[in-house]
Amino acid sequence: MKMFKSLSLLPRIVSPFQKCYSTDLISLVGIPRVKITKGQNRYLLVNIHTHGFTKYGRVIVRGADVDNHLTVFDSILEELEPQGICAKILGGGRILNEADSKKIKIYGTSRTFGSADHTRTRNILHSWTTYKDFKITVKN
């Protein structure tokens, strides 16, 4: 009988951990995988994760028409830090987004963060519904 009483305490012990992990994962899923503007962008390929849980990350693409990749990185931090999400830059480059003709060209490298895996970036863009029908070319 004592064993059943101790087992009845199990949900009380597990519940706080379950809530903690599930809310962290929900906050990751709520972040859009792609944010780029029309025209020429400097972009970063970023692995995001909740603090302490690097194993359960997600790769996102962020780009903007700015002077350098550090400005893109600063905007990423402004977006993610209030939610307690950490970012690790995997590399960068440029994206030419011709939305009218449904073409995207991924090329170049970031002097600050090194070159991103452009093929991986292309796959992420293709998985996003906005860019599913676009012709995406990669130039290394």
Curated annotation (Swiss-Prot):
Pfam families: Ocnus. Substrate binds at R42, S110, R111, T112. Keywords: Differentiation, Sexual differentiation. The keyword Signal does not apply. GO terms for molecular function: protein histidine phosphatase activity. One of its GO terms (biological process) is sex differentiation. GO terms for cellular component: cytosol. Gene3D superfamilies: Janus/Ocnus (3.50.20.20). The active site is at H69 (proton acceptor). The keyword 4Fe-4S does not apply. InterPro entries: Janus, Janus_sf. It comes from the Eukaryota. Belongs to the janus family. JanA and janB regulate somatic sex differentiation. PANTHER family: BCDNA.GH02250-RELATED, JANUS-A/JANUS-B. This is Sex-regulated protein janus-B. It comes from Drosophila teissieri. The gene is janB.
